[in-house]
Amino acid sequence: MLTHLDSQGRANMVDVTDKAVTSREAVAEAVVRMLPTTLQMIVSGGHPKGDVFAVARIAGIQAAKKTSDLIPLCHPLMLTSIKVHLAADGDDAVRITASCKLAGQTGVEMEALTAASIAALTIYDMCKAVDRGMVIESVRLLEKLGGKSGHFIADQAQVSS
């Protein structure tokens, strides 16, 4: 059953009033593939626009806080922790991991996914002048803790088709 639809099939924000406040956490990732020369420029600090990782990290943090403004049926949340980690992955990619936490009545999966996605888009924006062929891939939820549905770990779950 899709929880965002009412009995007539209309989009609706889920009522979480009676849900218990519990600790909730989610971790998401995104990967940006690029030319090795582009990655080298980022890692060496030689990008003319400045520190790509620092700007992407701040963009991801800001995005997590704005998720309910971007995704219509997401609840506005008082996140208690947002972390965005960026690192070179091989010689042609940046792997972004974003985690969000709160004590609340609804999960933070969308906030973590939004943080990872916007950090990836920020890397693309900052580097597009030197590498228009970059590819953003593997945006996914890695882990979710808390709430009624329990603990989810991506590599231990069946992939939806």
From Swiss-Prot:
Sorted UniProt keywords: Lyase, Molybdenum cofactor biosynthesis
Its EC number(s): 4.6.1.17
Alphabetized GO MF terms: cyclic pyranopterin monophosphate synthase activity
Disulphide linkage map: none
Pfam families: MoaC
Catalytic reactions on record: (8S)-3',8-cyclo-7,8-dihydroguanosine 5'-triphosphate = cyclic pyranopterin phosphate + diphosphate
Pathway membership, UniProt: Cofactor biosynthesis; molybdopterin biosynthesis
Gene3D superfamilies: Molybdopterin cofactor biosynthesis C (MoaC) domain
Active site as annotated: D125
Chain positions recorded as substrate binding sites: L73, C74, H75, M110, E111
BP GO annotations: Mo-molybdopterin cofactor biosynthetic process
EC class of the enzyme, as a word: lyase
Known function: Catalyzes the conversion of (8S)-3',8-cyclo-7,8-dihydroguanosine 5'-triphosphate to cyclic pyranopterin monophosphate (cPMP).
Homology family: Belongs to the MoaC family.
Subunit composition and interactions: Homohexamer; trimer of dimers.
UniProt-listed NCBIfam families: moaC (TIGR00581), PRK09364.1 (NF006870)
UniProt name for this protein: Cyclic pyranopterin monophosphate synthase
Organism: Pseudomonas savastanoi pv. phaseolicola (strain 1448A / Race 6)
